[in-house]
From Swiss-Prot:
<dbReference type="GO" id="GO:0140053">
    <property type="term" value="P:mitochondrial gene expression"/>
</dbReference>
<protein>
    <recommendedName>
        <fullName>ATPase synthesis protein 25, mitochondrial</fullName>
    </recommendedName>
</protein>
<feature type="compositionally biased region" description="Polar residues">
    <location>
        <begin position="45"/>
        <end position="54"/>
    </location>
</feature>
<keyword id="KW-0809">Transit peptide</keyword>
<keyword id="KW-0999">Mitochondrion inner membrane</keyword>
<dbReference type="InterPro" id="IPR040152">
    <property type="entry name" value="Atp25"/>
</dbReference>
<dbReference type="GO" id="GO:0005743">
    <property type="term" value="C:mitochondrial inner membrane"/>
</dbReference>
<feature type="region of interest" description="Disordered">
    <location>
        <begin position="317"/>
        <end position="346"/>
    </location>
</feature>
<feature type="transit peptide" description="Mitochondrion">
    <location>
        <begin position="1"/>
        <end position="66"/>
    </location>
</feature>
<comment type="function">
    <text>Probable mitochondrial mRNA stabilization factor.</text>
</comment>
<dbReference type="InterPro" id="IPR043519">
    <property type="entry name" value="NT_sf"/>
</dbReference>
<feature type="compositionally biased region" description="Polar residues">
    <location>
        <begin position="63"/>
        <end position="89"/>
    </location>
</feature>
<feature type="region of interest" description="Disordered">
    <location>
        <begin position="39"/>
        <end position="89"/>
    </location>
</feature>
<dbReference type="Pfam" id="PF02410">
    <property type="entry name" value="RsfS"/>
</dbReference>
<dbReference type="GO" id="GO:0048255">
    <property type="term" value="P:mRNA stabilization"/>
</dbReference>
<keyword id="KW-0472">Membrane</keyword>
<comment type="similarity">
    <text>Belongs to the ATP25 family.</text>
</comment>
Length: 725
C-alpha cells in the first residue's frame, strides 16, 4: 500500500512530506524541507492527510497529542506559534541543523570598495566611480566633496575630487588613457590629463630608458635615473564641467562680488597616483586636515570674530595699553568706513595683526604670549624694540658653564641639582645664582639660563626636559633681543638629540619623539621670521639624523643566522617603521634638490653613516659615487668610515665586495689616499669579516689577495710604531 501511495505521488516535495511523517512517528527528527507547497499536478487524496505536518520538524509524541486532542490541522501557509517553534528547535540535533555558509572576506576586498556618494551628487558620478573601480582597476578610491569651499580650489568651483591608486606606472598611463577615451565616447566630454603620455610615446621612452641602462651596465658605470617624465607617478584627469546635483530645499544662493552668473555646474577631477606617490603627497590629509569645509554661517561668525578682535587690538593700540608697540604701525581710528572692513578681505593694518592669529594661534602668536608664557613663540614683529645686538653671557657665568662642561658626567649631573627651578642645592647652583644677581645687564640672565638648561639636556639629566629648553628659548625670543644663528642651531640640535627618555623600555631602537621634533620645527619657524636661512645644510643634516634610529637596524624579516655578527650588532625593527623613515628621507632629499642645498664633507660623513645604519645600501653607494661628480675629494676620513662601517656590520659578502672594489681606488683619488696606520686598522678589521682565516693564511705564506693585503696593513702598522718610537 505504501509503495502504491509513493508511486502515485509524483511531486518531490510531497514525497518528502510522506517520508518525513513516517520518520516522525518513529521518533526520528528530520530537518524541514525546502519546498513548502506541494505540486499542483498531483491531486491525490493522500496529500491532505499530511498537510498538517508540512514546514516544521516534529516528533511522534506531538502528533499523537494533537490527534488525541482533536485539534484541527494547521494549514501549510499558517504561521507557527512562538512556543511551538522554540519547542521544535530544541529537539533538532546539531548534526541535522543547516549551517549558513559564511564567505571569507577577500584580502583585496577593502581596496576595491567604492566610496559612498555625497549629498546631491552629479548624475554621472555613480557611473564614473563604477567605471574607475571595475573597468579601469584603480584601488583605494577616495572621494572628496569640495563644493562648499570658500574660497574655491584653484581647479575650479563646485569641485569633486576622486583619488585612486594604480598598480604601476604603466597601469597609471593605461588607466588615464582609457578613462579619457571613455569620457569622450560615452558623455561627449573633452577631458584633459596632465602628466599623461601617449601610447607610442610611453613605449619609446621606456625602450630608450632600458637601452641606456643596458649600455651603462656594460661599461660598468652608474646609471643616474633622472626625471625623464615617465616616473612621475601622478596623472590628473580633469573631467570638466558636468551637470550638478539638485541643491537642497533650504539652500540659499550666496552673494558674490564680480561679473556674470553663479555657475550651477560641477567639476570632477580624478587624481591617479602610484602607491608611493600617493603616500608621499597625502592629498586626503591636505584637503581634509588643513582646510576643513566652512559653511556660510561659520564664515559669517568668523568675520564677526575677526572684526571684534581687530577693534579690540586697535583700541588697545590707541590708548597705549599694548605692551609691545611697533613704531612703524599706526592706529587706525574711526575714520575707516565700516563698510570697507570685510574680515578676510580687509586691507587695514592693526598692530601687525594677521588673519593667521585667529585661525591658528600656533602659527602666528598673539601679543599676550610673552606675558602668559603660553605654548607659542612671540613674533619678531610684536617683540619689544630693544638693542639690535645679541645678548652676551657675563664672563663669570661663562667660566662657570665651561667648568660644568669639563666635569665628568656623573659629577655634572650631581651639580645640576633637581631641575630648572633649583638654584641653591649645590655649590655650582649657588655660585651660578650669585653670578646672575651680580650681573650688570639683567637681560643677559635669560641667555645664561638657556645655556644651563641646554647643557643639562645634552647630559641627559632626568629633571631637565626638552620642554624646559623650549620654554627658555621662548623667554629669550620674548625679550626682543637678536638671537644669533649659532644659538638657534645649538638649541635645535639639542632638541633633536637622542636621549634615554626618547624611547620606551621595550623599544631598543631609539628614535626622537615626535613632540621633540615639533619643538625644533617651531624654533626654526621663529628663526625664519627673524630672517635666518633655515634651508641650510646644517639644518637638513640634523633633520636627517633625527628622522631615523640611533643604532644600526635591520628588518625583522631578514633571513639571517642568529649567531651572525650582523644579527648581534643590529636591532630588528618592523618593515613599516623602516618604510616610514625612508619616506621622510625621500621628502628631505627632494626638498634639498628643489632648493639646491649642497652638503659639505662633514654632512656627507653623517649622511653616509645614517644610510648604512638603516640598511639603505643603494642610497649609500649613490651618495658615495655622487661625491666624485660634485668634485668633492673622498679623503682619508671617508675611507676610514667606509671600512669601519662594513667591519661593524659584519656582513661577509658586503665586506668582501668593499675590499675588492675600493682598496685599489684609494691610490686613484685626487689627492691619493695612502695606506697609513688608521686605514690599516679598519681594513684589517674588514678583512677578518670577509675571511676569518686571513691571519693564519698570511702567516703560512699564502699568496692570495687577502693575505697580501693583510701583510701590507701589518707593515703599515709596524712602520707607524717605528716612527712614533
Amino acid at each position: 500500500m505504501h509503495r502504491l501511495m509513493l508511486r502515485g505521488i509524483q511531486c518531490y516535495g510531497c514525497r518528502s512530506h510522506v517520508i518525513q511523517s513516517f520518520l516522525a512517528i518513529a521518533d526520528i527528527t528530520f530537518p524541514a524541507p525546502r519546498y513548502h507547497k506541494p505540486c499542483p499536478r498531483s491531486p491525490l487524496h493522500h496529500q491532505s492527510s499530511f498537510s498538517s505536518l508540512h514546514g516544521q520538524p516534529f516528533r511522534g509524541q506531538s502528533i499523537a497529542r494533537s490527534a488525541s486532542s482533536g485539534e484541527p490541522s494547521v494549514d501549510n501557509g499558517s504561521e507557527q506559534s512562538p512556543d511551538a517553534a522554540s519547542q521544535s528547535n530544541e529537539h533538532v540535533p546539531w548534526y541535522l541543523k543547516e549551517e549558513t555558509a559564511e564567505l571569507a572576506s577577500h584580502p583585496l576586498g577593502q581596496q576595491q570598495l567604492i566610496p559612498p556618494l555625497p549629498d546631491n551628487p552629479p548624475p554621472m558620478l555613480e557611473d564614473l566611480l563604477q567605471h574607475i573601480s571595475v573597468d579601469i582597476g584603480l584601488d583605494d578610491l577616495s572621494l572628496l566633496d569640495l563644493r562648499n569651499r570658500n574660497p574655491p580650489p584653484a581647479l575650479g568651483a563646485n569641485l569633486i575630487m576622486i583619488i585612486g591608486t594604480a598598480r604601476s606606472v604603466k597601469h597609471l598611463n593605461v588607466a588615464a588613457d582609457r578613462l579619457c577615451r571613455w569620457l569622450r565616447s560615452t558623455y561627449k566630454l573633452q577631458p584633459t590629463a596632465d602628466g599623461l603620455l601617449g601610447r607610442n610615446e610611453l613605449k619609446i621612452k621606456l625602450r630608450r630608458k632600458a637601452r641606456r641602462a643596458k649600455l651603462s651596465s656594460n661599461v660598468s658605470s652608474s646609471f643616474e635615473e633622472k626625471d625623464d617624465g615617465i616616473t612621475t607617478g601622478w596623472i590628473c584627469v580633469n573631467v570638466g564641467s558636468v551637470e550638478n546635483g539638485k541643491p537642497a530645499a533650504g539652500a540659499q544662493k550666496r552673494d558674490f562680488a564680480g561679473f556674470g552668473n553663479v555657475a550651477d555646474s560641477a567639476r570632477i577631477v580624478v587624481q591617479m597616483l602610484t602607491e608611493e606617490k600617493r603616500a608621499e603627497l597625502d592629498l586626503e590629509g591636505l584637503w581634509n586636515g588643513n582646510f576643513p569645509p566652512r559653511s556660510p554661517s561659520e564664515l559669517r561668525a568668523f568675520e564677526q570674530q575677526f572684526e571684534q578682535f581687530a577693534e579690540k587690538a586697535a583700541a588697545e593700540a590707541t590708548s597705549g595699553r599694548g605692551m609691545y608697540r611697533d613704531s612703524r604701525s599706526h592706529a587706525t581710528g574711526s575714520g575707516i568706513d565700516p563698510g570697507q572692513r570685510r574680515g578676510l578681505h580687509t586691507s587695514r593694518r592693526v598692530q601687525s595683526i594677521s588673519i593667521e592669529a585667529v585661525l591658528s594661534p600656533g602659527m602666528v602668536p598673539r601679543q599676550e604670549a610673552a606675558l602668559n608664557h603660553e605654548d607659542h613663540l612671540v613674533s619678531p614683529r610684536n617683540a619689544p624694540a630693544k638693542a639690535s645686538k645679541p645678548l652676551n653671557v657675563p664672563p663669570e657665568i661663562t667660566s662657570l658653564l665651561q667648568h660644568l662642561a669639563q666635569l665628568p658626567r656623573d659629577d655634572a649631573l650631581r651639580e645640576l641639582g633637581s631641575g630648572p627651578r633649583d638654584m641653591g642645592s649645590t655649590l655650582f647652583l649657588r655660585l651660578f645664582q650669585q653670578a646672575l644677581d651680580n650681573a650688570e645687564d639683567p637681560d643677559g640672565n635669560i641667555l645664561a639660563k638657556l645655556e644651563l638648561i641646554r647643557i643639562a639636556v645634552t647630559l641627559q639629566h632626568p629633571q631637565y626636559t626638552k620642554a624646559d629648553l623650549f620654554d627658555a628659548f621662548k623667554e629669550l625670543a620674548a625679550s626682543g633681543y637678536d638671537i644669533s644663528e649659532s644659538q638657534a642651531l645649538q638649541t635645535v640640535k639639542t632638541l633633536l638629540s637622542f636621549g634615554d627618555n626618547d624611547a620606551d623600555v621595550s623599544n631598543v631602537a631609539k628614535r626622537v619623539l615626535r613632540s621633540d621634533i615639533d619643538l625644533a620645527l617651531k624654533v626654526l619657524n621663529h628663526m625664519s621670521l627673524r630672517g635666518m636661512d633655515i634651508l641650510s645644510r646644517e639644518v637638513f643634516s640634523m633633520l636627517y639624523t633625527a628622522s631615523g634610529f640611533q643604532v644600526p637596524v635591520r628588518p625583522t624579516n631578514d633571513n639571517l643566522s642568529p649567531s651572525s655578527v650582523e644579527t648581534e650588532k643590529s636591532t630588528p625593527v618592523s618593515a613599516e617603521e623602516l618604510n616610514e623613515v625612508r619616506l621622510v628621507q625621500d621628502r628631505l632629499r627632494k626638498i634639498m634638490d628643489a632648493f639646491d642645498v649642497k652638503f659639505g664633507p662633514e654632512q656627507f660623513l653623517s649622511l653616509l653613516r645614517f644610510h648604512f645604519h638603516h640598511g639603505n645600501y643603494d642610497q649609500f653607494w649613490a651618495i658615495w659615487r655622487k661625491m666624485s661628480l660634485l668634485q668633492l675629494p673622498r679623503s682619508k676620513e671617508f675611507y676610514v668610515l667606509l671600512f669601519r662601517l662594513h667591519a661593524e656590520r659584519g656582513n661577509q659578502k658586503r665586506a668582501a665586495e668593499c675590499l675588492s672594489s675600493w682598496v685599489p681606488m684609494m691610490a686613484r683619488e685626487q689627492p691619493p689616499v695612502h695606506l697609513d696606520a688608521d686605514i690599516a686598522r679598519v681594513v684589517m678589521a674588514c678583512l677578518l669579516v670577509a675571511n676569518p682565516d686571513v691571519k693564519q693564511r698570511a702567516d703560512a705564506g699564502d699568496p692570495g689577495e687577502y693575505p697580501n693585503l693583510w701583510n701590507r696593513c701589518w707593515n703599515a702598522l709596524v712602520a707607524s710604531q717605528t716612527v712614533q718610537e
